[in-house]
Amino acid sequence: MTIDNDDANPLAPADLPGIDATTEVSRVWGHIGAIIVDATLQRRQNYHTTVKPRVVALVAAWPDADTTSGFRRRLDTGKLSDVISWPSPGRLAQVEDITCVFERQGIETVVELQGTLGDPVKRSVLREALASVRHVSPKTLDYIDTLSGVSASAAFDVREHGE
């Protein structure tokens, strides 16, 4: 069946060949706190049973933590462990450290994070700062691209030409 207006309705990213919708689309967050928590918890954890439910709980409980300053206000209450049901101090310290990097880099919103990741110079500075956080590996850095909605191909182009 052909629709007269096919050109006006391009395929969504999840409809493109080779794109796994469960990986690429469902892991994009419009919430700084969600990006930080997801990136922190993903190491050696099952995404669907461990990470995603906790990030969804965070977004539901702390909708105002969608900015770095909003997330900071919530972090300072000391309740993150309860909100995401995560008692381990190591991961909670990593959340704190990544938040500090975002603050030092002046990244307040997901749009600003996307802009930073899309600029070769700023991207390099951010990745270097994040890499200094314990347990943030190159894989975690690339995963932050995914979580913020920066496509893998755009991130690759920046790495090839800018880093």
Model-derived segments and spans:
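Catalytic DNA-binding helix-loop module of base-excision-repair DNA glycosylases/AP lyases
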Residues: 40-41, 118-163
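Short helix-capping/linker segments at secondary-structure and domain boundaries
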Residues: 43-53, 102-110, 150
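Amphipathic alpha-helical interface surfaces
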Residues: 51-54, 91-94, 98, 126, ...
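Alpha-helical ds-nucleic-acid-binding substructure associated with the helix-hairpin-helix region
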Residues: 60-134
